[in-house]
Amino acid sequence: MCPVPSFTPGETDASAGRPSASQWHHDAVTLARQQQIQVVAHRGASDEAPEHTLAAYRRAIEDGADALECDVRLTADGHLVCVHDRRVNRTSNGRGAVSALELADLAALDFGSWKNSEASRTSTEGPDWEDTSVLTLERLLELVADAGRRVELAIETKHPTRWAGQVEERLLMLLKRFGLDAPTGAPDAPSPVRVMSFSARSLHRIQAASPHLPTVYLMQFVSPRHRDGRLPRGVPIAGPGIRIVRSHPGYVEKLKRAGHQVHVWTVNEPEDVDLCVGLGVDAIITNRPRAVLHQLGRG
């Protein structure tokens, strides 16, 4: 009888090509993390279609995104629309501040032609996007409701704005109309909607009016008061940018130790996806949901 080869954890049975016990454990942990990480489409599948358009969000749902991210701004006549910038100049064929324009003014603009111009630089024939008029949050909520599966929504309030707290007031009114301002189903079931902001004041307004809605504190840098992993009072989820995670990977552990979930934005490069998986983040917010899902073995 041939002797059974032995090896200690951390080694590999080279002759048989079998991974060691520690490698098996590492791979199992990595696989589990990949399956658990939520993939969030940043402004829709915005690498493939014009950001914040129905086309981008439809593509994200088709690609299998777990959640959709959007920015909301209030128009002059009180409608919440999905636009990132304060002004429409970059992403439409118009000009002016969203807060100074009425919905009818925005509806007359093309929010897809800039992407066509961008695509034409690398292709002889640019794509002909459909559904690229301004997108209201109401229409996006309808799309999610009709998705045929659970699709969560991460809504970012943009501040400062001339409308201040009216943004949160209108947002909660709209969520209430869709039955999304309070837990649905089992009492401990996670909410399908969360509200994000760089403004702690915005999140406090949401918490005061609708304490069951999860909130996310977004960060471009880590302020001294939050270096130990603390967040503004009552906020359960941290939203650091990928630059923070690259420069200070240990910060994720501090946030986790403080009991917070970690949702990282905007994660587009494969090496950054690997970094986030290794650190055990809870959500990856990306312009490329299909590519990230594929990298996580879920595509």
Enumerate the predicted regions with their spans.
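Phosphate-group recognition and catalysis centered on beta-loop-alpha active-site segments
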Residues: 3-299
